[in-house]
Design a protein with these regions (language model features):
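Generic recognition of well-ordered secondary-structure surfaces with a strong bias
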Residues: 64, 97-99, 137
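Short, acidic/charged, Gly/Pro-enriched secondary-structure junctions
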Residues: 78-108
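Solvent-exposed edge beta-strands and adjacent loop segments
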Residues: 1-69, 112-134
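C-terminal or internal capping secondary-structure element at the end of a domain, subdomain, or sheet
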Residues: 131-144
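Alpha-helix boundary/interfacial micro-motifs
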Residues: 53, 82-86, 136
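Short alpha-helical interface elements
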Residues: 37, 88-89, 140
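Residue-level signal for secondary-structure boundary sites
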Residues: 72-74, 105, 143
Length: 144
């Protein structure tokens, strides 16, 4: 089983990036992208030892790490500042994310996500370099 991730890419489209932006330059010290595990059901035991279970509503959380000051980071900064509430106005952008893994013929598509977190500026690390930038998206829809 080959688990090589080399060649994976992420494409993001939104009002801030209407033509879409494909990220292929992964940082050296963070995961290029992560999709958090989610709880989809809850199981309990009733008084007479019978199983009681139900489905849980949940959201998907995708974190993308980028190299600071790269073209990818500069484009994501545009999206960050577009989506950050300023004054009395909020721009809640609908973001479409496509993740293409090496060896897969079709990408994983995530629709109507929202950029919920990002770094507004660089952070200097003690080893003399800038920290990688992380951008976090949340939503509920995966298109199959």
């Amino acid at each position: 089983m080959d688990i090589t991730a080399i060649g994976s890419k992420i494409t993001v489209m939104s009002a801030a990036l209407p033509a879409g932006k494909t990220f292929t330059n992964a940082p050296d010290s963070d995961s290029f992208f992560t999709i958090d595990a989610v709880d989809i059901a809850q199981v309990e035991v009733g008084l007479n030892c019978h199983k009681i279970s139900w489905a849980l509503p949940n959201k998907l959380r995708i974190t993308v790490s980028l190299i600071p000051n790269s073209e990818d980071d500069k484009d994501m900064q545009k999206m960050f500042w577009y989506n950050r509430p300023q004054g009395m106005a909020a721009n809640i952008d609908s973001v479409q994310i496509s993740i293409t893994e090496t060896g897969k013929s079709t990408p994983e598509i995530y629709g109507d996500f929202t950029l919920v977190s990002g770094s507004p500026a660089n952070t200097a690390e003690s080893n003399g370099r800038f920290a990688n930038k992380q951008y976090v998206f949340e939503g509920v829809t995966r298109v199959f």
